[in-house]
Structures are given as structure tokens and as C-alpha cells.
Amino acid sequence: MFTSEIGVVEEWLSEFKTLPETSLPNYATNLKDKSSLVTSLYKVIQEPQSELLEPVCHQLFEFYRSGEEQLLRFTLQFLPELMWCYLAVSASRDVHSSGCIEALLLGVYNLEIVDKHGHSKVLSFTIPSLSKPSVYHEPSSIGSMALTESALSQHGLSKVVYSGPHPQREMLTAQNRFEVLTFLLLCYNAALTYMPSVSLQSLCQICSRICVCGYPRQHVRKYRGVSSRIPISSGFMVQMLTGVYFAIYNGEWDLAQKALDDIIYRAQLELYPEPLLVANAIKASLPHGAMKSSKEGTRCIQVEITPTSSRISRNAVTSMSIRGHRWKRHGDTELTGQEELMDITEVDEGFYSRAASSTSQSGLSNSSHNCSNKTSVGKNQRRSGGSKAGAKERETAGESCRDHFARKQTQRAQSENLELLSLKRLTLTSSQSLPKPSSQGLAKTAATVFSKSFEQVSGAPVPRSPSPAIGCVAGADANRFSACSLQEEKLIYVSERTELAVKCQAGQQGPPSISVTLSAE
């Protein structure tokens, strides 16, 4: 070490001893910016025979147990270098030169296994389940797991891994050495995002040295110093891979790649399945080109996350979908029913309008007085209420005009009924049936046109309407009527009304008639 570096370390040691507790947070914040101090401390740790090693280890332990977060992280950044020095000294069997480093490692370990109240810590980790989403997968992207997902989540099949409680250690032995070191490396990995680049570089170099020392690859790497093999555990190698994996994506591509290859090399020699599985998975996921991430940016492991999708499948049966399906089905049914009723109503109205117009025209032949009023049939129906002025005008009409008008109306009624019959045969087939009389069909929606004269009131015989005969059909087809049969019945009814009107004209002058139209809608 140079004299300047020794002076920086000695100044750091003396400064902390005279520092009051109130200014400790400001001191911890400014400490991480002293790069020259960090470099000098690395050199002190790398020289086991240095006189400054013991006070430096003591100072780092005081930082760690102070409770200040910044001072704790400052100590953790030297942890990989301290482990390497301890393992190197242990491999060379020089136990006396590693006493202060061993004490520091034991002190950090004993502080980490207990909480603030002095109780043992129990660390837990929940292994991700395929039924629940994570940063690596979405359950909906795997496939249709509607039933499987709910079943797995309800049964609670997620596996939880526990670590602890860990026992207190007073000294490091060959039996508990890697148990302590593995836990310390776990604590270091928990604070990886706060570690500077110098610490990540030290981690990668130490991982390579530990894995190749005493093996033929040591000559390829040209590592000097320790030439004996350093025993290592499977769990410790897995923790090394965690730190190396982070360093790959945070500016240390070359060193981390080299360390990854050395870890795979050592795991193959030791036949450790856990580090082989993790290391090969990391290597298979690496990009082909070097990662050029900024050392000053945010430190994190880059993971490609699939876009989130809806957890509810489009084909999933829910209460809303069932309710919507019912609404849609009822809406279609009601719409279809309304359309059918409209179709029937249109047919009924067409059938009724023809028959009603012909019947009304034949019934009004006795009360009409002017040939010019023969085209307005609807107005004559409304005006046939029996006003006195209309009655006087009808009494003064000539006999010849009434006979001529009656003959003409009879011919027109017959021609219109024949035309209606031909049209109905085109639109309605003879096989089409009408609903039962109890339902709202054509039999009830059709108009019932009747005309009562003052002669009927006085007791004169009037031919009965043939409409009741329509429903009196024997046999299995009692409720089925064809369009032709209905038209023929209506034609007979119209012809009878026409003959009756002609006979009444010859006997006496026709009194006013009342025409009522009933339609059940």
C-alpha cells in the first residue's frame, strides 16, 4: 500500500471515533461518495499481514451494528472480499492471520439471524404457482384454466420454503463454515441493488477464483496465490449464481460471463444438480450480444413480461352472461311474436276491409239518395246515425235512381268478392290454418259487421249471419279453415244481404240503418 492510501484509512478510523451520534446520518450519506477510501479499504483487506486489518474489521463491525442503513450497506459491499480472504487463509491453514476476519463474519452473522427484539428470524419464500399470476407468466396465456385455476387457488397448493431459525455461532469450523457463509451471501444478495460496481466486480472475480483454484482451469485464468482446492457447498454456489446473474445485466457482462462459466465448470466436477440447473437456465436465457447497460442507471434484472390479459375468459359462463342471454332470448321471442301478430293483423285487416266495404255498400243502398255519393262508403257509415235531415232527403229520392244504384252496387260487390278471392288464393294457401277460437286469431280479430234496421226492432224477419256457421265444423279440422272457405262464406253472406236489400226496396222505403264495427285487437 502507498503512504497516501494508509493515510486515508487512518483518517477514516479516527474520524468515526470522534463523531457525535447526531451527525451520524450525514456522515453515512457522504461516506459512499468517498471512492478513494473504498479502494484503500479493499487493499487493506487483501493483505492479511497488514496492521490496519484488525482496526478496519472492528470499524466495519461498528458500522453494521449501529443500525444506520447506509453504514450497514457500506459494510456489506466488502463481504465478498472478506469471504475470499477467509477461505484462502483457511485453505493455506494459516488460522492466526484470519482471526479478525472470522470475528467480523461471525458478528455480522449473529446480528442477522435475530430481529430487533432478539428473537430468531424465520425467513420464508413462496414458490410461484402456475394458477396465480407472476412477473413471469399469466394463467390465461397457458390455456383454458377456468376450473383448474380456481381449484388450485382454493386448495392452497403453493409451496412455502422456510429458512431458519439459525443457531448462534461462536466460531467457524469445517462443519458450519459454509452454513454461515451461505447465509451471509444471502444477506448480500438481498442488498444487491445498493451495491456499487466495485463490489460487483469483486464478487465476479472471487466466484471465479473459488471455483477454479486447484483445478486445471486455474492456469488458463492465470490466477496466482492459492493453488489448493477450496471446498464448496451446493447452496453456496447457488447464492453465487444469484449475484452473478444480477451483475450480467448491470454493467459487468464480461466478468459475470467468465464467472458463470467457471461455476458451471466446478458444478460439473462436483456433480451438484442445483447449481447446474440454475447455471444452465441462466446461460440459456442470456442474449447473444453483450449487454451495454449504464452503470449509473437503475440496477435491476431485465425480464420480458407478457402483456396482461383479462383474467375472465370470453366464453366463461357468469351471472351477467346468463342474464344477458335471457334478455336477448326474451327480446327475440317478443319481437317474433309482435311480427307474427302484425302479419296476421295485416292479413285480417285486408280480408275485413274488403268484406266490410262490400257489406256496408249493400246495406247503405236503401238509404242513399244521390248517385254522386256512391264512392264515399265510409262517410255514409258515419252519417247513417239517423239524423232528421238525412231521413227527409232519403224519402224524396226517386224510385228509379234507387233501383239503378242497387243493381250497380250488387254487381260491384260480386266483382270485388271475386277479386278478393283470387288475391287471397295467391297470398294464403289452402293448407294454412288459423288459431283456435279461444286464442287471439283471425276468427276473433276479424270484424263482425252487422246491421239492424228499424224493421228488426219491430220484429221483421231478418236472415241470420252465417258467421256462427264458420266455427261449427265437425271432425278433427273443426278449428282449421282455409282462405277459400272463408271467402266463400263471406261471399254467401254478402249475396244474402244484397238480395235482402233489393226486396226491401220493392216493398217499402228503407229506414235509416245502424252499422257497428267490432274488432278485437
Curated annotation (Swiss-Prot):
The entry's keywords: Cell membrane, Cytoplasm, Membrane, Phosphoprotein
Q: Name one GO cellular component term.
A: neuron projection
Q: Where in the sequence is Phosphoserine found? A: 321, 415, 422, 433, 453, 465
- Which stretches does the entry tag as region Disordered? 355-413
Q: Bias category Basic and acidic residues: which stretches?
A: 390-406
* Superkingdom of the source species: Eukaryota
Per UniProt, the ranges with Low complexity bias are 355-373
Modification Phosphothreonine, positions: 306
Hey, which family's this protein in? Belongs to the Hyccin family.
Function, in words: Component of a complex required to localize phosphatidylinositol 4-kinase (PI4K) to the plasma membrane. The complex acts as a regulator of phosphatidylinositol 4-phosphate (PtdIns(4)P) synthesis. HYCC1 plays a key role in oligodendrocytes formation, a cell type with expanded plasma membrane that requires generation of PtdIns(4)P. Its role in oligodendrocytes formation probably explains its importance in myelination of the central and peripheral nervous system. May also have a role in the beta-catenin/Lef signaling pathway.
Record protein name field: Hyccin
Q: What is the scientific name of the source organism?
A: Mus musculus
